[in-house]
């Protein structure tokens, strides 16, 4: 199995800076695992890495698609898998859990073709005849429709590898941080973003439907729905809630090795562990 290093954690935990130092030391390349930084024009508000911050390390899927271009988790999955095959030492860095897991594990996305469904009993009969070994909740119509769609496409559902089976040999680093400290860091970072032109960036994108933390609240401010202090408070509250969900998701779904993001020995600890993992 191809070895892949993955660095995840909440927004503001220091993933970007750590990943660049590690990649530079190991001759690795970084694949962006943040679903917002994939888009062009979303620069300041996404805390997108700059060319200077890359420090010569090759990055992929940064400003990859236009803001009005459809780009799904399936597109991300296919792009990342292609890159993993091409890169000698691939790192994936970001906090978008489903995106990261879909690329590294055997997620299979159902085709969204128009399918005419018979009644439930007829679908169950077709499923049972075509795939006697299937395990499915027959009291769940959506599950039945999904299995039926798969059967008529010519593929047995029971032969599908479960989505919790990894396709690669993964070393997963989760950067953890005390929530009070994280909140302070986020507040400082938000002030810096505004100094850099976050409000102006959002104003230039005002006609886009941006349901993204930060852009959404600044857009409301620009539309006169609240003042700037209220917008900032809402951004921090939403970001902290998101960080809590991120931690729960990664710990439960991907079982990472948890590191203290504020440890003075963090770089040395990660470097040592990754070297052991990749065998250098």
Curated annotation (Swiss-Prot):
Site feature (Interaction with substrate tRNA) residues: 96
InterPro entries to which the protein is assigned, alphabetical: Dimethylallyltransferase (IPR039657), IPT (IPR018022), P-loop_NTPase (IPR027417)
Residues that coordinate or bind ATP: 9-16
EC number: 2.5.1.75
The protein's required cofactors: Mg(2+)
Assembly mode: Monomer.
PANTHER family membership: TRNA DIMETHYLALLYLTRANSFERASE
Name of the protein in its database record: tRNA dimethylallyltransferase
């Amino acid at each position: 199995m191809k070895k892949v290093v993955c660095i995840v954690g909440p927004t503001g935990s220091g993933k970007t800076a750590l990943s660049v130092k590690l990649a530079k030391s190991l001759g690795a390349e970084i694949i962006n695992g943040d679903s917002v930084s994939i888009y062009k024009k979303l620069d300041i508000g996404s805390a997108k890495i700059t060319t200077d911050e890359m420090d010569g390390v090759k990055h992929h899927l940064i400003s990859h698609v236009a803001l009005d271009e459809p780009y799904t988790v399936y597109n991300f999955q296919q792009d990342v898998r292609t890159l993993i095959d091409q890169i000698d030492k691939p790192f994936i860095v970001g906090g978008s859990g489903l995106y990261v897991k879909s690329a590294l594990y055997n997620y299979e996305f159902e085709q969204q073709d128009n399918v005419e469904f018979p009644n439930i009993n007829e679908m169950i009969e077709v499923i049972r005849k075509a795939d006697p070994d299937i395990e499915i909740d027959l009291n769940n119509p959506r599950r039945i429709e999904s299995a039926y769609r798969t059967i008529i496409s010519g593929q047995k559902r029971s032969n599908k590898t479960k989505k919790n089976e990894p396709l690669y040999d993964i070393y997963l680093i989760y950067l953890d941080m005390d929530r009070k400290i994280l909140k302070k860091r986020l507040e400082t970072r938000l002030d810096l973003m505004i100094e850099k032109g976050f409000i102006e960036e959002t104003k230039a994108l005002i006609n886009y439907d941006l349901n993204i933390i930060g852009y959404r609240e600044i857009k409301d401010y620009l539309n006169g729905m609240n003042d700037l202090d209220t917008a900032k408070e809402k951004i921090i509250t939403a970001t902290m809630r998101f960080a809590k969900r991120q931690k729960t998701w990664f710990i439960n779904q991907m079982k990472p090795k948890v590191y203290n993001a504020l440890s003075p020995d963090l770089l040395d600890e990660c470097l040592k562990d990754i070297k052991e993992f990749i065998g250098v």
